[in-house]
């Protein structure tokens, strides 16, 4: 049975995609729960139109993410941390601290879940963070950890 998904469904497909599933799965679970529609001609046309609009929105979001990446890559972000002897930080720099520094110094609001590090940051100096701005746009941001006075 062919159905049109109303939202992304892990292991099955993406929103507005036409997929084939077993009739019982469609009738007893996907359609009653509101996850899918029967793929008749009318619904197929609506899904195609929605897919075109969604593709246009995604292209715009990608373009916006690229412009943000260009702007952020040119900035020098500084993060203050409490330091012990030998220049070692108490604890480690976290994605939340990076997100807060970005918001404070640039005005860009980043989700902490989109920020990652290659390895834990426990020393002073220049380091890199990987920020996922979009599915296809990933920024490697250089930042400096300085001692808090």
Curated annotation (Swiss-Prot):
PROSITE patterns: RIBOSOMAL_L9 (PS00651). InterPro entries: Ribosomal_bL9, Ribosomal_bL9/RNase_H1_N, Ribosomal_bL9_bac/chp, Ribosomal_bL9_C, Ribosomal_bL9_C_sf, Ribosomal_bL9_N, Ribosomal_bL9_N_sf. Keywords: Ribonucleoprotein, Ribosomal protein, RNA-binding, rRNA-binding. GO terms for cellular component: ribonucleoprotein complex; ribosome. It comes from the Bacteria. Pfam families: Ribosomal_L9_C, Ribosomal_L9_N. GO terms for molecular function: rRNA binding; structural constituent of ribosome. One of its GO terms (biological process) is translation. Binds to the 23S rRNA. Belongs to the bacterial ribosomal protein bL9 family. HAMAP family: Ribosomal_bL9 (MF_00503). This is Large ribosomal subunit protein bL9. It comes from Amoebophilus asiaticus (strain 5a2).
